[in-house]
């Protein structure tokens, strides 16, 4: 098969794709103000909520996301209204402290890592994030080159910032006339969230789950040596999609910082889940069972504050991360 020259371009035809691009992320935090300062004031997302849920909705939410019966909580949504395919962030605000999924901001620590934002130019966003009090993880914007498949280089400008609960926010701009790695607002030049990443200890195991259960495809697998320590970075996409990609990062055992041991899912704080639209929840849950994945919540109907009326289920990825699948139901 002749591969596209741009590694971000689709390989397989997406007309029969079982699963769409990453559509939602679940973030659990007690610090809504700081999260809002980062995502809304810094990156331009719109905040909706807190929402009032009736008893039946709360029952469904507790089952779907694993929220204990004795834990009170509120829900908000952060979204980029003018970019319909941007990831919608469900924010769960518990009424008491829950464990943090990550111990530190360290890149090498195993666990859910970041949401990523594509943009045409990074400098203005970088200045704003610094003014808002967020620490850039490097002394300056990181400027480096990647290669197209024919070997030609193209420039990348990237910066990551420490936000809440030991997670990061990544801003990235592709140069050389290439499209960004997700849709951007034509007026602001900023898009996303459009991708998300996990630091994992077994990339092949995680890749098998996302390709065999969710029908994703691998687009890139690189050894990144422009950072120290070096790491392997694999990108997975929905068939036919140019946004909503997953990044899996693996360090050599000697370079890893171990996981906190806190399960990477609600009600624990941090980046706690991903949400994917599917053609059939039943088909995907059957595939999950076939490949030995644990079903966290069986399919049920409920009103999701991001996606409306859905049939949804949740499945455990091999690392224990919460994966939500949903199909929209006509009103």
Locations of regions flagged by a protein language model:
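Flexible internal linker/loop segments at domain or repeat junctions
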Residues: 235, 240-266
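A short, acidic/glycine-rich surface segment
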Residues: 9-11, 57-62, 97-102, 146-148, ...
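Core segments of cupin and vicinal oxygen chelate
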Residues: 28-84, 131, 142-154, 198-245, ...
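Short consensus segments that form the blades of beta-propeller domains
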Residues: 16, 66-68, 103-107, 185-187, ...
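Vicinal oxygen chelate
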Residues: 1-18, 27, 50-51, 85-91, ...
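Loop/turn-rich, solvent-exposed surfaces of beta-rich toroidal or solenoidal domains
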Residues: 262, 270-273
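Long low-complexity, intrinsically disordered regions
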Residues: 32, 280-281
């Amino acid at each position: 098969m002749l591969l596209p020259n741009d590694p971000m371009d689709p390989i397989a035809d997406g007309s029969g794709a079982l699963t769409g691009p990453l559509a939602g992320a679940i973030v659990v935090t007690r610090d809504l103000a700081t999260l809002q300062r980062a995502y809304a004031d810094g990156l331009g997302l719109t905040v909706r909520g807190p929402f009032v849920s009736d008893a039946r909705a709360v029952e469904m939410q507790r089952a779907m996301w694993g929220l204990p019966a004795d834990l009170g909580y509120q829900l908000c949504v952060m979204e980029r209204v003018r970019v319909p395919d941007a990831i919608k962030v469900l924010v769960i605000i518990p009424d008491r402290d829950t464990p943090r999924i990550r111990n530190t901001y360290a890149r090498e620590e195993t666990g859910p890592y970041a949401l990523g934002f594509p943009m045409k130019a990074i400098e203005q966003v970088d200045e704003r994030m610094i003014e808002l009090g967020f620490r850039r993880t490097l002394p300056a914007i990181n400027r480096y080159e990647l290669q197209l498949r024919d070997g030609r280089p193209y420039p990348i400008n990237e910066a990551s910032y420490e936000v809440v609960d030991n997670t990061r926010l990544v801003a990235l701009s592709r140069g050389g006339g290439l499209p960004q790695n997700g849709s951007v607002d034509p007026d602001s030049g900023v898009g996303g969230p459009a991708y998300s990443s996990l630091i994992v200890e077994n990339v092949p195991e995680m890749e098998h789950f996302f390709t065999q259960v969710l029908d994703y495809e691998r687009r890139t697998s690189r050894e990144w040596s422009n950072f120290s320590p070096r790491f392997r970075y694999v990108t997975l996409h929905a068939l036919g999609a140019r946004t909503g990609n997953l990044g899996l990062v693996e360090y050599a055992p000697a370079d890893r910082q171990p996981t906190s041991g806190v399960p990477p899912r609600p009600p624990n704080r941090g980046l706690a889940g991903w949400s994917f639209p599917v053609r059939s929840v039943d088909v995907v849950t059957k595939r999950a069972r076939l490949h030995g994945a644990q079903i966290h919540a069986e399919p049920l109907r409920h009103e999701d504050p991001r996606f409306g009326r859905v049939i949804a289920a949740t499945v455990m990825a091999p690392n224990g991360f919460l994966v939500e699948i949903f199909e929209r139901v006509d009103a």
